[in-house]
């Protein structure tokens, strides 16, 4: 699906290659974008776009906004990354090396007032749930394409590219041997 078909997303940046760094990619956020948008704690859906085509749909409510959410992808060559972020990091790197344009778009929804149960009763609080938004976005995509975006491996019940899954295993083996 082309990003042009999406009516609710805003572009927030472009992925770039990093030189001489463990992490192979970075994001250049749009300079004219209000910085508050990048760090706002609203529930958010992110769309990773390659040459105009949606490749990945994900969601988050992590503190620190879209910048914090994307740090999991940008810094996937350090620490103890899971397979999905590690592989997507390398897929973005591969696309950029092949001269593709890889962009980041975001969809947010306002917080809503809801009654939430605690241990001793309930209270009205503002909530920002991304899961329903993410599910709707994936469902909308599926209704048009009859599959999920290519990099949503789990939803598509597909294996990760074998070469990249091997790199993930090697990365963790090396990391554990250093301890």
What kind of region is each of these model predictions?
Residues 1-43, 47-55, 61-179:
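Boundary/linker segments flanking structured domains
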């Amino acid at each position: 699906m082309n990003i042009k078909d999406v009516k609710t997303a805003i572009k927030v940046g472009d992925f770039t290659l990093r030189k001489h760094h463990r992490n192979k990619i970075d994001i250049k956020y749009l300079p004219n974008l209000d910085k508050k948008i990048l760090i706002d704690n609203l529930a958010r859906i992110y769309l990773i776009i390659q040459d105009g085509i949606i490749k990945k749909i994900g969601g988050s409510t992590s503190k620190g906004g879209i910048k914090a959410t994307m740090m999991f992808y940008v810094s996937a060559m350090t620490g103890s990354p899971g397979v999905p972020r590690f592989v997507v990091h390398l897929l973005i790197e591969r696309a950029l090396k092949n001269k593709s344009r890889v962009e980041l778009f975001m969809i947010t929804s306002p917080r809503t007032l809801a009654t939430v149960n605690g241990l001793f009763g309930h209270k009205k609080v503002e909530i920002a749930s991304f899961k329903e938004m993410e599910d709707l976005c994936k469902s909308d995509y599926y209704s048009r394409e009859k599959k999920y975006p290519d990099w949503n491996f789990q939803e598509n019940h597909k294996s990760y590219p074998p070469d990249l899954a091997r790199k993930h295993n090697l990365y963790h083996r090396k990391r554990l041997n250093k301890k």
